[in-house]
């Protein structure tokens, strides 16, 4: 653990997926934001749920869009609500449709009003109804007109009257 902070970003960048996957939670916690940014995006798919939950909000917020896309959709439910609410709008926009479909209702509820407009329209359209009904009225108020237009009939029908009214539907 004491040797990890001494690794340069060039050293981190050449770690294999297997090496990244066996980093302990303590070792992951000691990585600087710059070191996390140096992890190859393809290596992130080897992180366990516990390892993902160990990452600080600062470490996650420092990740590139290719790193965000490097997570498997099956890993998405491991992110805590706090981690989700601290992602940048660029990172929110980087999630693939498949990744977005893996978000839990608690994670959807964790989006801030400044993050919601960054959710790509195609991701909104492909979210399940259990996900979309998890949006609060404050979050729905932050929807762009394009996001509202992308909602499917099933999604709209699943909303409460209050949610539909918030969207002007």
Give the residues covered by each predicted segment:
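General marker for long, soluble alpha-helical cores
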Residues: 1-169
